[in-house]
């Protein structure tokens, strides 16, 4: 059956986020900031949530192209903070179309296994981890996403009723290629937490279908951020051949344009028929790494 409405195949229309209202947790640095800049520069109104007020204010002042980055100080792992922020947005705007749950931590230092590592040395390194640090990694990387989703569901539902954009409301959760790789790129706690948040998001995508709220997962490889600064710096002196092996087959880490392309696709009409998907942006790293993706 043909539609009486002629679809627009113009990229500027398909990938437009003009008029979209978004919330990005952990939006003041790293991948979160890349997402915020891409959305706001293309016409979205973006609330950014983070703990450091001075960093949030600096982003709003220096990075906003249209004055539509609104800083809201708060800890996305705190239920009282989330309730306060939701109340503020409800009063000011009344709805959102997109939640990007991006807040997270890297967790413990990786456990290194070299050709000379003995089993007793490995056991010592594994056993020495403070259980509270292991638990914190899950609490932040999984729990923060869970409670952010729960907190913003009413505003996402209101976005569907508002109908200011064609696509239905959506939550995008930042995971990692660490969720899929069998060679641990970080500590086991980090990789496991990202696998957990990935599966949880897929379950939300299934559970909330009747409410027309979509859920998708963004799984980045190596991007520059506060969290990865040391890793990125350590790769600077590598030869092109070494970079292709250790960083990605494309020989580089991700950049703002790479992340902007992902988020504009997912958040716009171009991605309106996506739900329960995992978008891997890693320069092909998982293609050359043992993985379960």
UniProtKB/Swiss-Prot annotation:
CDD domains according to UniProt: SDR_c
Cross-referenced SUPFAM superfamilies: NAD(P)-binding Rossmann-fold domains
Keywords: NADP, Oxidoreductase, Virulence
Binding site residues for NADP(+): 31, 102, 190, 194, 225
GO MF annotations, alphabetized: oxidoreductase activity
Residue positions of the active site: 175, 190, 194
UniProt function note: Short-chain dehydrogenase/reductase; part of the gene cluster that mediates the biosynthesis of the phomopsins, a group of hexapeptide mycotoxins which infects lupins and causes lupinosis disease in livestock. The role of phomF within the phomopsins biosynthesis pathway has still to be determined. The pathway starts with the processing of the precursor phomA by several endopeptidases including kexin proteases as well as the cluster-specific S41 family peptidase phomP1 and the oligopeptidase phomG to produce 10 identical copies of the hexapeptide Tyr-Val-Ile-Pro-Ile-Asp.
Annotated protein name in UniProt: Short-chain dehydrogenase/reductase PhomF
Source organism: Diaporthe leptostromiformis
Gene: phomF
């Amino acid at each position: 059956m043909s539609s009486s409405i002629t679809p627009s195949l113009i990229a500027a229309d398909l990938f437009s986020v003009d008029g979209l209202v978004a919330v990005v947790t952990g939006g003041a640095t790293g991948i979160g900031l890349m997402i915020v800049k891409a959305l706001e520069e293309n016409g979205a109104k973006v609330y950014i949530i983070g703990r450091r007020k001075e960093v949030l204010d600096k982003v709003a002042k220096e990075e906003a192209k249209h004055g539509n980055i609104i800083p809201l100080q708060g800890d996305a792992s705190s239920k009282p903070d989330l309730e306060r922020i939701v109340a503020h947005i409800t009063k000011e705007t009344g709805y959102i179309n997109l939640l990007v749950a991006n807040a997270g931590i890297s967790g413990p230092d990786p456990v290194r296994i070299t050709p000379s590592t003995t089993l007793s040395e490995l056991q010592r390194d594994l056993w020495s981890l403070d259980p509270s640090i292991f638990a914190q990694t899950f609490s932040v990387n999984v729990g923060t996403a869970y409670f952010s989703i729960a907190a913003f569901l009413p505003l996402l539902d209101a976005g569907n009723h508002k109908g200011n954009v064609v696509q239905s409301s959506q939550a995008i959760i930042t995971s990692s290629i660490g969720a899929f790789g069998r060679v641990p790129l970080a500590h086991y706690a980090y990789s496991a937490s990202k696998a957990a948040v990935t599966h949880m998001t897929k379950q939300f995508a299934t559970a909330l279908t009747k409410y027309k709220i979509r859920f998708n997962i963004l799984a980045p490889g190596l991007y520059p951020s506060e969290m990865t600064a040391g890793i990125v710096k350590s790769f600077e002196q590598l030869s092109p051949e070494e970079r292709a092996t250790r960083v990605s087959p494309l020989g580089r880490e991700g950049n703002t344009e790479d992340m902007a392309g992902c988020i504009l696709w997912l958040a716009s009409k171009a991605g309106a028929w996506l739900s329960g998907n995992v978008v891997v942006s890693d320069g092909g790293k998982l293609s050359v790494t043992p993985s379960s993706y």
